Amino acid sequence: TGSVRDFKQGITGGVASYGDYAYYGDDTGILQCVDMNTMQAVWAIDLGESMMCTPALETEEDGGVYLYTGTALGKTGRSAQIRLLKIDALTGDIVWECQSAIKGKYASKDAKAGSYAGVMASPLVGEGEINDLIIFNVNHVELDDKSICAVVYALDKATGEEVWNQPLDVDSKSSPIG
């Protein structure tokens, strides 16, 4: 039983791996961990909207293993919010979520924009002088002045709080580089 959706499920991003586990998200908003030896799901969480990026994986000095990922609006129509998340890779528990600054709009049918809103590519896990940051490129964000562009957000890895942001002059669907 359940509802039939009017789109096909697919995996747009790539797979991250740690040990025997593979992590990936799909167009329906399900992020899951699969044991590559048994091909059985270890955990799965519903993020409420499409995942089009490859999750970024980081192992921390304390032994924790974490995924950083985000969603894109419009494919499922179940959510009106772009989500940026840190997830415990071993349990599937959400460590933090940042939504406050992002007001994205879905505009794929808009001939001028021709673009999804949200996280379209993997975030950058900061190293060296920026090892406390995770950096997301979020496409098609509506700013306070109602203009729409991509925005690069740097978040504190520990808390998910925004450290800085930089609006871009155009849409952008690429991973940030450091």
Please annotate each region the language model reported.
Residues T1-G178:
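Extracytoplasmic/lumenal domain signature
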